[in-house]
Amino acid sequence: MSARDNEKGSARSQPSHAAASEIENVPRPSRQQSWTGTMIKVFIICACAGIVSKYIIPLDSIFKSVHIDPHDYATRANRILSTTPLIDGHNDLPYLIRLETKNKIYDHEKLPFRTGLLSHTDQIKIQEGKLGGQFWSVFVECATDPNAEIDDPTWAVRDTLEQIDVTKRLVQEYPDLLEYCESASCAKAAFKRGKVGSFLGIEGGHQIGNSLASLRQVYDLGVRYITVTHNCDNAFATAASTVAVGKPDLGLTDFGREFVKEMNRLGMLVDLSHVSHQTMRDILSVTKAPVMFSHSSSYALSKHLRNVPDDVLNGVTKNGGVVMVTFVPSFLKVDDPASATIHDAVDHILHVAKVAGWDHVGIGSDFDGTADVPEGLENVSKYPRLIELLLERGVTDEQARKLIGENILRVWSNVEEIAENIRALGEKPNEETWSGRKWTAAIDIPMPFMFKDSADKRKEL
């Protein structure tokens, strides 16, 4: 700025003596008038804020309603994933951590979760895939000896507790990305905060030692679903893998009915993935709450016993549950797994939706739980492409929202509500034990008796 400009500016900034005199003669408002005027302004601002909050559409709703070319599938998919949490029913990353680091997670050079792992799940892939919530499997395998007695729970329960521990610690280690949750409402709130809600699921009743007392304890530790069986029978039910090797499908046991009843009382999701087809039907006939299949596909499209037959899909509709379609190639295309692609996953989703309805389908990848993946679904980052392809096949935005998260959140909320109602009626914890249970022998030192027949009771141990 030149000196001349400065002079002009200075001249303009100085009022004349006459003008100054006029200003001085203007009556100033009294202190009472100033206070009143301020309060009026505050009232107007508050009133406007109230009107906005009551009548103006929330920002996420505005985003949802912005017009987008219906053929711009990528933008539609991005909008859907940005406003509705994609909640995956099953991911086995904690088990990989167990296998490869013995649950040591704090050395970020040895476990570069932020910068990238060769497996299916890490921070970069999660963010690229717009994952909105994850049921992390705190999986422990069945006994390697197929003839092992199922009442040998010591190591399985111990290892399950370790998996619960490492999963919680993993979530705590990355608080900018993950948020631990034990309820459907928390899952929704975490997504609004920009975090991936992280929930715990146990993959097999063997992991709780076939015990309802253990069931209650893992619930208290935050586990929110249990897969009734894994690839082995237990005290509760027959597994699909048992039927696959030619053994009879005995379905749900009497004790299994007590197990389901107690899960309903607690508010824990009953997961039917891995169970035999008869077990599926039996559980649907006795449960008081909606069920889930955390990672299963359609038996009509691929005759793998891990998949769900159409009659069971119809049963899920009546039950109000959800079938979360998985990406395991042998489940998608049992006759030729190597040729499975993302399009096969789309086919399975559409079939489940056609038979069960769009209110009863979800996504349960089984990422990091299978070495083989379909072409196009190599890892967690591929979810947006999956949604794009579904939209290309005619799926509406509303249907896609139900698929990716609204359905499982509804089921979870319903399970919680039913449990509250059951407990409100005064139902107490189930004290039943499995008939094949081997009780720990009494210690060989004198102990006082509680009853007249105590000696006989102790002989039964």
UniProtKB/Swiss-Prot annotation:
Cofactor: Zn(2+)
Ranges annotated as biased composition (Basic and acidic residues): 1-10
Pfam families in the record: Peptidase_M19
Example GO molecular function: metallodipeptidase activity
A GO CC term attached to the entry: membrane
Residues involved in Zn(2+) 2 binding: 203, 274, 295
Catalysis performed (reactions): an L-aminoacyl-L-amino acid + H2O = 2 an L-alpha-amino acid
Covalent S-S links between cysteines: 142-232
Residues glycosylated per entry: 379
Cellular localization per UniProt: Membrane
GO BP terms in the entry: proteolysis
Membrane topology note: Single-pass membrane protein
Enzyme class at the top of the EC tree: hydrolase
Known EC number: 3.4.13.19
SUPFAM superfamilies listed in its UniProt record: Metallo-dependent hydrolases
Binding site for substrate: 230, 306, 366
InterPro entries: Dipep_AS, Metal_Hydrolase, Pept_M19
Function, in words: Hydrolyzes a wide range of dipeptides.
Similarity-based family: Belongs to the metallo-dependent hydrolases superfamily. Peptidase M19 family.
Descriptive protein name: Putative dipeptidase CPSG_01350
Taxonomic classification: Eukaryota, Fungi, Dikarya, Ascomycota, Pezizomycotina
